[in-house]
């Protein structure tokens, strides 16, 4: 029994040592795996922090690129707004130029109308001057003055002055004619009065002669008739009284009566003629007066028209000067506007070209930035994929760590069970040794010299395993 037991004990001791060594090796491999996993976890965390930092930098760069893109878009919009404003300014300047051209055309039309009106006034004044000259100039000189073109070259004021002088001369000539006509009328009236007085005296003498003829003889009547004929001859109405007296002296009383009737008829005829002449003179005088009144009215109207025309001509001249100044100013303004428009056009074209160049450059920059952004996006996608992979690896490492912890816990339980079994076996061995010692103290002393050393090694291994386990647990807790 003892030998068998010792054989069994001999066979159990190396197996327990091998198990202990295997467990120790497994525990050391687990420690190395744990340390490698821990180093991988640290590296993954460092890489994760680096990737997070790179991601933040990429986000900052993306924000900066977006800001730059927004600034470029704002600059492009500002340039577009500037172009639109410049186009509006060009349209406004074109409208102002067209308005100025329309005003200039209207003013040129007004100036042409004024010039036509002035020409018509010149023609009318020249015609009036010619009419006045035709009344005063004889017929031989009219053709020469009509053929000359001296009035066409004169100005309006000179024509007006000439018309005024011609009207003054015409008024003076009409006054002279009027005075002559009035004098002739007065002379004719005086002659008519004298004739009436003489006729009355002749009639009175005739009546006295008839009375005396009735009272006296025929000779005395003939003498009276001769006296009456002489009186009529003195006046200027000799009607052949001498012949009638001679015939009456031959014929008798009948001839005397016929002669008296003829004298009366001749006197009546002369009176009628004188009355007709006086009435004609009165009519001519009234006509001359009417003509004078008409001429006065015409002269007054013409003077008023001339004054109005002079005032209007002065106004027109002032307007012409003002319009000429305005036209010059407008021409200068139009030239300045055209020069400004040309400058604006050149500036706008240059700015448009510069803007197009800048837009092209910015488009190129935007394309480059877009390509860079796409590259950054692809890099971000890659980094995110890597981060996901690393997170998955970290999760796998955590799972492996948990599995390692579970395996460590199982190993600890197993080690505890084995330790308890080893202690139980130690106790059995000690009891067996004690029993053997009791039986024979020096029987197995030199057979099992190193029996207690495995116990010390196992205790040291368990101590090192527990210490490494506790250190690993502390590190895992610290990392967590």
From Swiss-Prot:
Q: Which PANTHER family match?
A: OS08G0559800 PROTEIN
Region Disordered: start and end of each range?
Answer: 1-20
Q: What is this protein called?
A: Uncharacterized protein At3g49055
């Amino acid at each position: 029994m003892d030998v068998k037991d010792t054989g069994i004990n001999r066979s159990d001791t190396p197996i327990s040592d091998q198990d202990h060594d295997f467990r120790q090796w497994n525990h050391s491999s687990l420690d190395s795996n744990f340390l490698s996993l821990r180093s991988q976890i640290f590296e993954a965390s460092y890489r994760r922090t680096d990737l997070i930092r790179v991601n933040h930098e990429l986000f900052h760069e993306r924000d900066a690129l977006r800001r730059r893109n927004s600034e470029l878009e704002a600059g492009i919009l500002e340039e577009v707004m500037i172009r639109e404003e410049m186009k509006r300014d060009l349209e406004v300047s074109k409208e102002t130029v067209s308005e100025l051209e329309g005003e200039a055309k209207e003013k040129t039309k007004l100036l042409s109308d004024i010039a036509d009106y002035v020409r018509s006034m010149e023609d009318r004044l020249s015609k009036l001057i010619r009419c006045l000259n035709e009344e005063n100039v004889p017929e031989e000189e009219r053709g020469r003055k009509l053929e000359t073109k001296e009035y066409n070259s004169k100005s309006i004021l000179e024509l007006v002055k000439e018309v005024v002088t011609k009207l003054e001369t015409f008024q003076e000539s009409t006054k002279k004619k009027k005075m002559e006509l009035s004098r002739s009328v007065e002379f004719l009236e005086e002659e008519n009065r004298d004739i009436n007085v003489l006729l009355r005296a002749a009639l009175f003498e005739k009546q006295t002669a008839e009375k005396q003829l009735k009272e006296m003889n025929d000779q005395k009547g003939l003498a009276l008739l001769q006296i009456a004929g002489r009186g009529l001859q003195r006046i200027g109405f000799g009607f052949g009284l001498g012949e009638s007296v001679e015939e009456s002296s031959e014929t008798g009383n009948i001839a005397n009566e016929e002669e008296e009737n003829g004298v009366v008829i001749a006197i009546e005829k002369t009176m009628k003629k004188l009355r007709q002449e006086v009435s004609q003179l009165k009519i001519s005088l009234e006509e001359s007066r009417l003509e004078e009144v008409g001429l006065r009215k015409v002269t007054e109207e013409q003077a008023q028209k001339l004054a109005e025309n002079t005032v209007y001509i002065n106004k027109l001249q002032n307007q012409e000067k003002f319009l000429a100044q305005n036209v010059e100013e407008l021409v200068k303004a139009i030239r300045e506007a055209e020069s400004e428009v040309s400058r604006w056009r050149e500036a706008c074209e240059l700015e448009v070209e510069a803007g197009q160049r800048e837009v092209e450059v910015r488009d190129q920059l935007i394309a480059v930035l877009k390509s860079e952004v796409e590259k950054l996006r692809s890099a971000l996608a890659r980094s995110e994929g890597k981060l996901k992979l690393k997170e998955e690896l970290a999760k796998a490492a955590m799972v492996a760590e948990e599995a390692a912890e579970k395996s460590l816990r199982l190993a600890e339980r197993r080690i505890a069970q084995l330790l308890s079994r080893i202690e139980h076996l130690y106790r059995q061995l000690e009891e067996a040794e004690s029993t053997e010692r009791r039986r024979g103290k020096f029987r197995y002393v030199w057979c099992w010299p190193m029996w207690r050393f495995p116990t010390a090694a196992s205790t040291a291994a368990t101590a090192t395993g527990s210490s490494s386990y506790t250190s690993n647990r502390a590190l895992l807790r610290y990392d967590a």
